[in-house]
């Protein structure tokens, strides 16, 4: 896994000439089953060259999703609906105040390398956080974006963004969830992403003392996306 900005060649994921990426934004929380259905249909259309690549910005109502590596034991308390999903990763929470970015890109046009694609998603979020004065970091052994929390003790880090993707015919779907101002107590019902080490928790921009609107996040995401993915 690429673990530093210096070793990540962003040019690798610039698309070959074609239609620009379509940006979609949903203003109301989207039920999870409907979102998955929409992603799968769009990914199939992209793979068949019938639709442009797309980034979909949305929120979900409170729920849990369990990826292909998930364990039932990591659901401590079933307070909200649980959905099994084909994305990579383990169990996580989605809810209001969290910016979900579902990323449907044709990696054949870019670079058919899953590990580097995930590293580019991390870089995208790191650059977005930097726009708000937050230093996000990637870790080789823990997918996602992390924030050092020395105020909580030596070696303590909190995850601020989770990543889980699936590919079909080299078109990605699912994507990234960035904690802006969700109810962090809802993460107590699970072992987030299977990480049980007490040094590693969950945070949000609000938890870090920043009051940021989702519209501001969306603008930063769109700007930094072009820096990383080239369109």
From Swiss-Prot:
Say where the protein is mainly found: cytoplasm
Kindly indicate whether the keyword Cytoplasm belongs to this entry: yes
Listed pathway(s)? Protein modification; protein lipoylation via endogenous pathway; protein N(6)-(lipoyl)lysine from octanoyl-[acyl-carrier-protein]: step 1/2
Cellular component terms (Gene Ontology): cytoplasm
Class of the enzyme per the UniProt entry, highest EC level: transferase
> Which Pfam families does the entry link to?
LplA-B_cat
* Source taxon at top rank: Bacteria
Q: InterPro entries, alphabetically?
A: aa-tRNA-synth_II/BPL/LPL, BPL_LPL_catalytic, Octanoyltransferase, Octanoyltransferase_CS
What residues correspond to the site Lowers pKa of active site Cys? 159
Q: Where are the transmembrane segments?
A: none
Ordered alphabetically, the record's keywords are: Acyltransferase, Cytoplasm, Transferase
Q: Which residues form the BPL/LPL catalytic domain?
A: 49-231
Binding, substrate: 87-94, 162-164, 175-177
Give GO terms: molecular function aspect only.
Answer: lipoyl(octanoyl) transferase activity
CDD domains, per database record: LipB
UniProt family annotation: Belongs to the LipB family.
What is noted besides the main data? Answer: In the reaction, the free carboxyl group of octanoic acid is attached via an amide linkage to the epsilon-amino group of a specific lysine residue of lipoyl domains of lipoate-dependent enzymes.
Extract the HAMAP family matched here. Answer: LipB (MF_00013)
State the PANTHER family in the record.
LIPOYLTRANSFERASE 2, MITOCHONDRIAL-RELATED, OCTANOYLTRANSFERASE
Q: What name goes with this protein? A: Octanoyltransferase
Organism of provenance: Nitrobacter winogradskyi (strain ATCC 25391 / DSM 10237 / CIP 104748 / NCIMB 11846 / Nb-255)
What is the gene called?
lipB
